Amino acid sequence: MKESNNYWYVYIILCDDNCYYTGITNNLINRFTKHKNGKGANYTRSHKPLKFLSAWEVDSVNTALSIEHYIKSVNKKIKVLFAENNRLLKQYYVRDIKNKGKRDCNSISVRSVSKKKLNSINTLLNN
């Protein structure tokens, strides 16, 4: 399964203690493998990653970083909503940045990675 490195991904991973980890990458498979092997973020060294719950494709690292920061700022109840229905992220994120008057929301491109693709990636990673 080849991924395009022209895009960045924001993702939520379920960890073994039922907590969520949010991060960014330009390659979902390689990044998860690093997390799983203890070479990713410090957080996933002590909270073992199990699978991707949600992921979104964006056009730039700056957008990815901004969305990652936003997801990390919301409570777990909202993160659960994003994990269950990944199409909600863009709606919530755009509303948040509009309220803060930060940037032009019309230029933001956030595409949900399908549950089918995530399931395929999770299956591949667990074999």
Model feature map: region roles:
Residues K39, D59:
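Residue-level detector of flexible, active-site-proximal loop/helix-junction positions
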Residues N42, H69-A83:
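Short arginine-rich
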Residues L28-I29, S60-T63, K76:
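Residues at or immediately preceding the N-termini of alpha-helices
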Residues N42-K48:
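Arginine/glycine-rich "motif VI" loop of SF2 helicases in the C-terminal RecA-like domain
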Residues M1-N37, K48, F52-A55, L65-H69, ...:
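GIY-YIG nuclease catalytic motif and its immediate N-terminal context
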